[in-house]
From Swiss-Prot:
Signal peptide: none annotated. One of its GO terms (biological process) is regulation of translation. One of its GO terms (cellular component) is T=3 icosahedral viral capsid. Homodimer. The capsid proteins form dimers that assemble by group of 5. Twelve such pentamers are linked together with free dimers. The homodimers binds to the viral RNA via an operator hairpin, but also to many other RNA sequences in the viral genome; this interaction probably shifts the virus from the replicative to the assembly phase and ensures specific encapsidation of the viral genome. Coiled coil: none annotated. One of its GO terms (molecular function) is structural molecule activity. Belongs to the Leviviricetes capsid protein family. Keywords: Capsid protein, RNA-binding, T=3 icosahedral capsid protein, Translation regulation, Virion. This is Capsid protein. Its main location: virion.
Amino acid sequence: MATLRSFVLVDNGGTGDVTVVPVSNANGVAEWLSNNSRSQAYRVTASYRASGADKRKYTIKLEVPKIVTQVVNGVELPVSAWKAYASIDLTIPIFAATDDVTVISKSLAGLFKVGNPIADAISSQSGFYA
């Protein structure tokens, strides 16, 4: 069983990294937040459910805020202008070995690796072209 612990969500090489810390584990849903106020925080939730007798289902959700500065009475305050949302449902057969699941985890990381088509489309706010 995975332990709830802090982890680096956005790795910027040590400068401006975003670390999220566990804040809740209620009703089977684990939640992590960055150190900002809730409205300005990066947020990750993850849950695990049995899906039939032979499958495990993981649901991972991510919120990424766009932080801007707003001036109120001459004081600059950080506020969230908007948030981007992601949701991933992952269903794994119960008989998958540790090596199989490691490959699945690496595949998920590879989907969004800089330079891959999915990451490029997201970065350029475009679709997919031949």
